[in-house]
């Protein structure tokens, strides 16, 4: 799904793409491994996209998206597009951009991830990746049921679910 969003930005001729990500913890000491950042970096390297000074991580929240975007703006050199690892991060980033009179998508394109309801109500409406939360819940419930029923042992697994890019109005093709 990350690759789909980045391919979309590449098709729109973006050669400088930023990343605003988050960290989640399983408990106070164990960091949950989210591969979105790794996929982002690998895609950029393979496609000769500049990303290095535009890579920031905080939390998966509006506030963190806002703070990371302010930090990026204060660096002075903005990318032409930003991939946000969640819609709340993107919504916070959008607010920071608007407060600094940086127009989306005219000055910078913005893509979120999750397709939360609020993403279609932002100005402009946010282009995002739809991740099927209901399907994730079904898989999770099935796994827990099988473990409790002793049909399977509790082993780590990674499940890839189909995601869809929802194209709205926060991205623009550049020359």
Positions of PLM-derived features:
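Bacterial carbohydrate/catabolite-sensing allosteric modules
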Residues: 1-175
């Amino acid at each position: 799904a990350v690759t789909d969003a980045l391919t979309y930005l590449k098709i729109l001729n973006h050669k400088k793409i930023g990343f605003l990500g988050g960290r989640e913890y399983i408990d106070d000491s164990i960091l949950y491994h989210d591969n979105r950042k790794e996929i982002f970096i690998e895609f950029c390297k393979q496609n000769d996209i500049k990303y290095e000074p535009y890579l920031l991580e905080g939390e998966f929240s509006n506030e963190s998206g806002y703070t990371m975007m302010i930090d990026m703006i204060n660096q002075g050199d903005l990318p032409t597009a930003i991939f946000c690892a969640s819609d709340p991060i993107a919504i916070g980033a959008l607010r920071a951009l608007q407060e600094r009179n940086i127009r989306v998508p005219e000055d910078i394109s913005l893509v979120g991830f999750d397709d939360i309801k609020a993403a279609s109500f932002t100005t402009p409406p946010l282009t995002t990746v739809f991740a099927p939360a209901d399907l994730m819940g079904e898989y999770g419930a099935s796994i827990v049921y099988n473990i409790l029923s002793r049909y399977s042992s509790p082993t780590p697994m990674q499940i890839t679910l189909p995601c869809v890019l929802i194209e709205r109005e926060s991205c623009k093709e550049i020359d």
